[in-house]
């Protein structure tokens, strides 16, 4: 189950890039740098919340950018004088329910889903981690232009982001060490005695700082956009009988009706069909294999919990939902007033945007068992992207 948030500080200037606007708004491969960065986290199965920290005078521009690129469920706050002030403002927006907080530079658009996962899982295991790569080049110490010594690179690492920690540890670090000027969160954590574990970063996960960095980013992101994504498609179907003395739950929503669906769980045909579609897409059988009706553990369970479990399996294979199309076949009751609420619940459970989930209801014009009001059925088709 996703329990992570990411703070993306993007309140810097474009001075070293020789721009008259913040570098994160500069387009690379046809898309602003900050949009590339947000997209890397937006559908990641571990990330439940994104907090974007931007300059005060670019707040409205940032809001318009998110709307233009249909980036939903993102909180925007304005930054402070120092990076750590910006991160602290973002940290104050992290929900109480979140356990793991990642911090990632807005100008590192080439971060991979695999690196995000490594940092998230590393923080779960160790408490605090930092993405880094071993220093490969020979390092020289100098005074002016004169070499005064060679630095032993043994044990030296080049820090990157994401940097991740349990929220409580990060809050402690800011409370006890926040007045000190630092360049990253790891230094804050180290300063209060919290061990920070090195996580293998990536040579391509560069921070765009100088004009020449744009050449690498342009080539990398353009190549990344061009190949066809690995996709998988699944179809699911479920049907349950309508009976007395049962609640009617569809798409996680309780619907007022004198009949409910019979079943071992809450018999939510919509969620069950979607679970089967997801399991089918990843080649993992069906819902009965994973949640058998012979187990008391699933007796009367709210099926959204089953969906969250299935999505965890999907995420472990580094897949995410591209879109899902769901058709409920039901003569009565009328479902139209409840479809938006269903859509919101499903999107939240699947860690995707509301626009990625389409739910529609139809009838069989009083033909067959659904037409006679004996039951409700549902078809679901889902596309997964890696």
UniProtKB/Swiss-Prot annotation:
Keywords: Isoprene biosynthesis, Lyase, Metal-binding, Multifunctional enzyme, Nucleotidyltransferase, Transferase. One of its GO terms (biological process) is isopentenyl diphosphate biosynthetic process, methylerythritol 4-phosphate pathway. SUPFAM superfamilies: IpsF-like (SSF69765), Nucleotide-diphospho-sugar transferases (SSF53448). Its cofactor is a divalent metal cation. CDD domains: CDP-ME_synthetase, MECDP_synthase. One of its GO terms (molecular function) is 2-C-methyl-D-erythritol 4-phosphate cytidylyltransferase activity. InterPro entries: IspD, IspD/F, IspD/TarI, IspD/TarI_cytidylyltransf_bact, ISPD_synthase_CS, MECDP_synthase, MECDP_synthase_CS, MECDP_synthase_sf. The record marks 153, 207 as: Positions MEP for the nucleophilic attack. Its EC number is 2.7.7.60, 4.6.1.12. It catalyses: 2-C-methyl-D-erythritol 4-phosphate + CTP + H(+) = 4-CDP-2-C-methyl-D-erythritol + diphosphate; 4-CDP-2-C-methyl-D-erythritol 2-phosphate = 2-C-methyl-D-erythritol 2,4-cyclic diphosphate + CMP. Residues 232-386 are annotated as: 2-C-methyl-D-erythritol 2,4-cyclodiphosphate synthase. 4-CDP-2-C-methyl-D-erythritol 2-phosphate binds at residues 238-240, 264-265, 286-288, 362-365, 369, 372. Pathway: Isoprenoid biosynthesis; isopentenyl diphosphate biosynthesis via DXP pathway; isopentenyl diphosphate from 1-deoxy-D-xylulose 5-phosphate: step 2/6; Isoprenoid biosynthesis; isopentenyl diphosphate biosynthesis via DXP pathway; isopentenyl diphosphate from 1-deoxy-D-xylulose 5-phosphate: step 4/6. The record marks 16, 23, 264, 363 as: Transition state stabilizer. A divalent metal cation binds at residues 238, 240, 272. Gene3D superfamilies: 2-C-methyl-D-erythritol 2,4-cyclodiphosphate synthase, Spore Coat Polysaccharide Biosynthesis Protein SpsA, Chain A. Bifunctional enzyme that catalyzes the formation of 4-diphosphocytidyl-2-C-methyl-D-erythritol from CTP and 2-C-methyl-D-erythritol 4-phosphate (MEP) (IspD), and catalyzes the conversion of 4-diphosphocytidyl-2-C-methyl-D-erythritol 2-phosphate (CDP-ME2P) to 2-C-methyl-D-erythritol 2,4-cyclodiphosphate (ME-CPP) with a corresponding release of cytidine 5-monophosphate (CMP) (IspF). In the N-terminal section; belongs to the IspD/TarI cytidylyltransferase family. IspD subfamily. In the C-terminal section; belongs to the IspF family. PANTHER family: 2-C-METHYL-D-ERYTHRITOL 4-PHOSPHATE CYTIDYLYLTRANSFERASE, CHLOROPLASTIC (PTHR32125:SF4). This is Bifunctional enzyme IspD/IspF. It comes from Desulfotalea psychrophila (strain LSv54 / DSM 12343). The lineage of its organism: Bacteria, Pseudomonadati, Thermodesulfobacteriota, Desulfobulbia, Desulfobulbales.
């Amino acid at each position: 189950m996703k329990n992570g948030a990411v703070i993306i500080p993007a309140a810097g200037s474009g001075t070293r890039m020789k721009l008259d606007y913040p570098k994160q708004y500069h387009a690379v491969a046809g898309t602003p740098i900050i949009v590339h960065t947000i997209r890397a986290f937006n559908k990641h199965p571990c990330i439940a919340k994104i907090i974007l920290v931007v300059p005060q005078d670019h707040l409205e521009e940032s809001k318009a950018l998110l709307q233009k690129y249909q980036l939903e469920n993102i909180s925007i706050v304005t930054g402070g004088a120092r990076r750590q002030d910006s991160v602290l403002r973002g940290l104050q927006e992290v929900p109480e329910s979140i356990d793991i907080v990642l911090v990632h530079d807005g100008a590192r658009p080439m971060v991979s889903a695999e690196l995000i996962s490594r940092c998230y899982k590393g923080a779960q295991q160790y408490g605090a981690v930092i993405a880094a790569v071993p220093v490969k080049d020979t390092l020289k110490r100098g005074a002016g232009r004169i070499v005064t010594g060679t630095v032993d690179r043994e044990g030296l690492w080049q820090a990157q982001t994401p940097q991740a920690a349990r929220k409580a540890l990060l809050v402690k670090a800011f409370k006890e060490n926040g007045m000190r000027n630092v360049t990253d969160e790891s230094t804050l954590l180290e300063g209060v005695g919290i061990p920070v574990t090195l996580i293998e970063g990536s040579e391509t996960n560069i921070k765009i700082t100088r004009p020449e960095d744009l050449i690498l980013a342009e080539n990398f992101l353009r190549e990344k956009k061009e190949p066809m994504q690995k996709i998988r498609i699944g179809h699911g179907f479920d049907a349950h009988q309508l009976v007395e003395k049962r609640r009617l739950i569809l798409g996680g929503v309780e619907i007022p009706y004198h009949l409910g669906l019979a079943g071992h769980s809450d018999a939510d045909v919509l969620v069950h069909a979607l679970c089967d579609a997801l399991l089918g897409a990843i080649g993992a059988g069906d819902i009965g294999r994973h949640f058998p009706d012979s187990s008391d553990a699933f007796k009367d369970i709210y099926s959204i919990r089953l969906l969250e479990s299935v999505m965890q399996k999907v995420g472990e294979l580094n897949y995410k939902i591209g879109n899902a199309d769901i058709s409920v076949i039901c003569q009565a009751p009328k479902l139209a007033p409840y479809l938006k609420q269903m859509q919101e619940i499903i999107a939240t459970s699947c860690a995707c945007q509301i626009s990625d989930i389409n739910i529609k209801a139809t009838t069989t014009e009083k033909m067959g068992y659904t037409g006679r009001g004996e039951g409700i059925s549902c078809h679901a088709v889902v596309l997964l992207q890696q």
